[in-house]
Regions:
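Secreted/periplasmic serine-hydrolase-like ester/acetyl group-modifying domain
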Residues: 69-156, 239-252
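Soluble non-cytosolic domains of exported or imported proteins
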Residues: 33-37, 49, 133-141, 167-170, ...
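Conserved, well-ordered alpha-helix/loop/beta-strand core segments that scaffold catalytic motifs
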Residues: 54-66, 113-197
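Histidine-centered active-site loop/cap adjacent to the catalytic His
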Residues: 205-246
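Extracytoplasmic/secreted proteins, especially bacterial periplasmic and envelope-associated proteins
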Residues: 13, 17, 38-42, 54, ...
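Membrane-embedded segments
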Residues: 3-4, 8-87
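Second-shell loop/turn segments in exported
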Residues: 3, 28-32, 130-136, 160-166, ...
Length: 252
C-alpha cells in the first residue's frame, strides 16, 4: 500500500503501527509541500517496481493554488524528473541542503514521528454548508490521471483527509465528496469523525491544528487499521522473511 500527499500524509497514519497490529505494509510517498503533479509521477515511478493493492491519497494538496505559468513550469519539471531520475535525486539533495527536513524529525517508512504539543483553541471549524471550495483545474487533471493510472493497474484508490482545523473546512469536504461520488471512490474525512476518534485538540496536534502529533496519529491509525481490514483483502506479512526489515524498524 502506498500513500500520496503533502505533509498531512506524513503525520496522520503510522505504517509501523499498521505493521505491528495487522502486518500490512504501507509506505508514505508524501513530502512537505508536495504538489499533486509530483504525486502522480511518484506513483508512476513506484509502479515500475511495486504492485500495491491500495493507494491512499491525502486531499490537502488538491487545494494548493498556483498561477498558470507556475503550474505549467511545475508540470514540466515533474515530467522531466520522471524521465530523467538524476534530476529527482538532485532535488532530494537540494531539500536536505536547504534544511527542508526539520531537525529532530524521525521518519519510519515515510511517517514523521513528532510528539510535541501546541494546542488548537479556536473552536468548531466544520460548519455545514452546501458551498464547495474550487479545486484548481490542473489539480483535477492530475487527480484524474492518478485515478486512471490506478484503474489501469487494478489498484484501489482511497481518498482521505487528515484531521486539521488549519487546512480543512466543509467547503473542501463537499468538493472532495462530489469528486469521490462521481467516480465511486471511497472517501474518509477524519474531520467528520472527531468525536468517534476521540481527537482532543489540546493534546493531539503538533502546531495549533495544522498537523497531528504522534498522539493524534495513533487515533487515526487505529481507525484506519479497522477500516482496511473490513474493506480490503490485504495480506499479513508478519513472519515473512522478505519483510524482516519491517520487524527491525518496528522494534526501534
Amino acid at each position: 500500500m502506498l500513500v500520496l500527499g503533502d505533509s498531512e500524509s506524513m503525520t496522520s497514519i503510522s505504517p509501523m503501527e499498521l505493521w505491528k497490529s495487522v502486518g500490512i505494509t504501507r509506505y508514505i510517498c508524501g513530502q512537505s509541500g508536495q504538489r499533486i503533479s509530483e504525486s502522480y509521477y511518484m506513483l508512476k515511478h513506484a509502479l515500475d517496481y511495486q504492485s500495491p493493492q491500495v493507494v491512499l491519497l491525502e486531499t490537502n494538496m488538491l487545494f494548493r493554488y498556483t498561477n498558470t505559468p507556475d503550474s505549467l513550469r511545475s508540470s514540466i519539471s515533474d515530467t522531466a524528473m520522471y524521465y530523467f531520475p538524476v534530476l529527482q535525486y538532485h532535488n532530494l539533495w537540494k531539500n536536505i541542503v536547504n534544511d527542508q527536513i526539520p531537525e529532530g524529525w524521525q521518519s519510519y517508512k515515510g511517517f514523521a514521528i513528532r510528539s510535541g504539543v501546541a494546542a488548537y483553541s479556536k473552536g468548531s471549524y466544520m460548519k455545514k454548508t452546501k458551498k464547495e471550495k474550487e479545486i484548481p483545474q490542473i489539480n483535477l487533471w492530475y487527480l484524474d490521471k492518478i485515478r486512471k493510472l490506478c484503474e489501469k493497474n487494478k489498484i484501489q484508490l482511497l481518498l482521505y483527509t487528515s484531521a486539521s482545523p488549519v487546512n480543512h473546512n466543509y467547503k473542501r469536504y463537499n468538493a472532495v465528496l462530489k469528486y469521490a461520488g462521481k467516480y465511486g471512490i471511497p472517501y474518509i474525512d477524519f474531520n467528520q469523525k472527531l468525536k468517534e476518534l476521540g481527537i482532543d485538540w489540546k493534546n493531539d496536534t503538533l502546531d495549533k491544528g495544522d498537523h497531528l502529533n504522534l498522539s493524534g496519529a495513533h487515533k487515526i491509525t487505529d481507525y484506519m487499521t479497522m477500516y482496511l481490514q473490513e474493506h480490503y483483502m490485504l495480506p499479513d506479512h508478519r513472519g515473512d522473511e522478505k519483510f524482516t526489515s519491517w520487524d527491525t524498524m518496528a522494534s526501534q
